[in-house]
Design a protein with these regions (language model features):
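N-terminal [4Fe-4S]-dependent radical SAM core
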Residues: 1-27, 36, 40-46, 65
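Flexible loop residues that form catalytic
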Residues: 43, 76, 135
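Classical nucleotidyltransferase
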Residues: 124, 128-143
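Structured loop/turn residues at beta-strand edges in well-structured enzyme cores
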Residues: 33, 66, 125
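Short Fe-S-cluster ligation motifs
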Residues: 59-79
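Canonical radical SAM enzyme core domain
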Residues: 45-58, 79-123, 129
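Conserved, mostly hydrophobic/aromatic
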Residues: 26, 77, 130
Length: 143
């Protein structure tokens, strides 16, 4: 994880709406999907937010343990940052936390690509819950 950085659009220390249980959320910058009615449009830019070391992100996550049950990767598009997130995910799992990931890519697409990319395979293997497919406002649940 030494000297690796991630373009981060935002970070929530504690969230109850981005997966099951209290969790931290890493919002990455950059997305090519251009979903209609995207709820995080500003995060589509790969330059939005701040370049943060994976070490610093992990320290922030660790500061929330034992309160949190897991970490969610959202964005932007997490799968645009496969190499960085696969390294971060490995460290998160060593803390005993679960990982959720929201991606605009479909599970079918990921299945086709997974054997072509070692880091993708490693990342997907670390994810406990994958929420796939482009954002569709008609499927949004309002409580």
């Amino acid at each position: 994880m030494e000297n690796k950085y991630l373009q981060v659009a935002g970070f929530l220390d504690n969230s109850l709406v981005n997966g099951l249980g209290l969790r931290s959320v890493v919002f990455v910058s950059g997305c090519k999907h251009n979903c209609k009615e995207c709820q995080n449009k500003e995060m589509q830019s790969f330059c939005y937010g701040d370049k943060i070391s994976l070490k610093d992100i992990l320290k922030r996550i660790e500061s929330n343990v034992p309160l949190i049950r897991g970490v969610t990767f959202s964005g932007g598009e997490p799968l645009e940052h496969i190499k960085e997130l696969s390294s971060l995910a490995e460290e998160i799992k060593s803390l005993g936390l679960n990982i959720w990931c929201y991606t605009g890519y479909t599970f079918e697409y990921i299945k086709k690509e997974i054997n072509k990319n070692h880091d993708l395979k490693k990342l997907i293997g670390s994810i406990d819950v994958l929420v796939d497919g482009k954002y569709d406002k008609s499927k949004k649940i309002v409580l």
